[in-house]
Amino acid sequence: MRFFPPLEQGRLLRRYKRFLADIELTSGEQMTIHCPNTGSMLNCMREGGLVWFSRSNDPKRKLPGTWEISETPQGRLACVNTGRANALVEEALRAGTIAELAGFTALKREVAYGEEGSRIDFRLEFDGAPVYVEVKSVTLGYPDTAVAAFPDAVTQRGAKHLRELAKLARQGVRAVQLYCVNLTDVEAVRPAEEIDAAYAQALRAAVADGVEVLAYGTRLDAEGIVIDRRLPVLLNP
């Protein structure tokens, strides 16, 4: 995935009201941009740190800029636009990069399923047999470790998705939880039990019920993002 037009650079002044961020451009101009991330963005940003944003020419938009990449306190880069994860995964699926899911004959997005009113990110078909794939974007890193963690805030919705996947797996349907790690310098992923113990428990229960768990890392810079390698998932770090 290439950023076009190219991203612009600034420095973070503050993030507030969840969806807003004030930045200062290299010219010294200050502007408010949209923050497309509903999470806490823990360890994902710092005041004065570099940010990169895309700019829209749509006159109907109240805020023309969208925050895409952040410099973390550890000096990593994180793609904070969570909406990019599904597009990245679809790109990788169609390219055959995710070997465990290669060879599908059909792909549908945002398909309704389950007993709790969920929508699956991807429903693949392999010779008529469905495979359900739920995607989560991982951006939480810690100092002095190359292990990223998910989630960065309590997520009842994430636990619900795991329950739905587990129900499918118990019925003999292939179900996959896929973590798209949009953070540089990462070698593995784990559940963030210190933030959401219920989610970590739900993940381990889902695996016990037959849900497959995959994690893929990305190569990320201000020019683009691409999924490029599988990462281990540490269920009991």
Curated annotation (Swiss-Prot):
One of its GO terms (molecular function) is DNA binding. Signal peptide: none annotated. InterPro entries: SfsA, SfsA_C, SfsA_N. It holds the Pfam family SfsA_N. Disulfide bonds: none annotated. NCBIfam families: sfsA. Belongs to the SfsA family. This is Sugar fermentation stimulation protein homolog.
